[in-house]
Amino acid sequence: MLSPKRTKFRKQQRGRMTGVASRGNSIHFGDYALQALEPAWITARQIEAGRRAMTRYIRRGGKIWIRIFPDKPVTMRPAETRMGSGKGSPEYWVAVVKPGRIMYEIAGVTEEVAREAMRLAAYKMPIKTRFLVRNQEEQQQEG
């Protein structure tokens, strides 16, 4: 599973997920992409589950790029612990995803295979997503 090798601080504040993604919202590497339509925290486990589903479906053909990285630690208190005595310890990592963010890209396969692989990955995500094609995405931005 993905997680940072080292961070400057062990714990982070929760923050807010307002607005749309200003970066990482266009296809850069592959021919097809999976784009987020809602804001959410995507856990490292969910990212890995999506990657596995896609890899298993496309088998040996094609290449997959994961465009999000879980760099935010989420802390949790032990069960049945009284209030106070500081913040809990980091339990897992999440990627903050805003609407418009490209999560996965794929190349080297046909559109039907890519669409099905992305559909399998989308089932693993806790948000609504959409399938993008590189040349169609460029036409939408112009028009």
Swiss-Prot record:
The record's annotation in CDD domains points to:
Ribosomal_L16_L10e (cd01433)
Example of a GO MF term: rRNA binding
One of its GO biological process terms is:
translation
> What parts of the sequence cross the membrane?
none
Keyword DNA damage found: no
Q: Mind telling me which Pfam families this protein's record contains? A: Ribosomal_L16
Recite the UniProt keywords alphabetically.
Ribonucleoprotein, Ribosomal protein, RNA-binding, rRNA-binding, tRNA-binding
Enumerate the InterPro entries for this protein: Ribosomal_uL16, Ribosomal_uL16_bact-type, Ribosomal_uL16_CS, Ribosomal_uL16_dom, Ribosomal_uL16_sf
Q: Could you name the Gene Ontology cellular component terms for this entry?
A: cytosolic large ribosomal subunit
Database matches in SUPFAM superfamilies: Ribosomal protein L16p/L10e
Q: Which Gene3D superfamilies has this protein been placed in? A: Ribosomal protein L10e/L16
Please give the HAMAP family that the UniProt record associates with this protein.
Ribosomal_uL16
Protein family (similarity comment):
Belongs to the universal ribosomal protein uL16 family.
Sum up the protein's function in the record's words. Answer: Binds 23S rRNA and is also seen to make contacts with the A and possibly P site tRNAs.
Subunit structure, briefly? Part of the 50S ribosomal subunit.
Q: What is the protein name stated in its UniProt record?
A: Large ribosomal subunit protein uL16
